[in-house]
Every structure is written in C-alpha cells, then in structure tokens.
Amino acid sequence: MTPQVAVVAPLPPAARAVDADYAGAIRALNETLAENRNRLDPATIAKVEASLEVIDHAIDEARQALAADPSNLTILDLLASSYERKVELLRRANALLPRT
C-alpha cells in the first residue's frame, strides 16, 4: 500500500515575506534559549515550550489557510500576529535568563 502524501499549495508571496521577516529573529532567539535552557527552571522551560507549540500550531493553520486563500488579508494579518507573539514569547523567555 502506498502511503498518502498531503499536497500543500505553495504560499503566496506575501506570506513568504512575513515568514522571512520573522525568521532571523526567531532563529537567533531560539538559539540563545537552547544554549541557556539549563539555566532556567525546568517548569519554566515546559511552560515556554507548551506556549510555543500553541503558537506554532496557529502559524501552521494560518499558513495552510493562506495556501488555500492567498488573497485573504485577514489571514495574513493573523499569520503576522502569530509570529509577533512567538518573537515576544522568546524575548521574554530569554529575559528570564540569569545575568552573568
């Protein structure tokens, strides 16, 4: 039996631009948090990771919706807002790191 493969429509240019706008900040903040996660309480890390999962799910849903309806500006705004929430959460998590 051949496994089913989901076909995902390509993202419209506006959505790719939103992805690109936040990619660098998210990557840098994720790297800093990953390098220093042992300096935070495990319960804090668990809460941050749970919140990131919720945000990532919202980002995935918005991207799927934009692939299906590329001209929907409301969904594009939701995508950007989700990325903003992710960046803010990562900034706050990094701000919790003890200063050395």
What function would you assign to each model-found segment?
Residues M1-T100:
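Polar, acidic low-complexity tracts enriched in Ser/Thr/Gln/Glu with frequent Gly/Pro and Thr-Pro motifs
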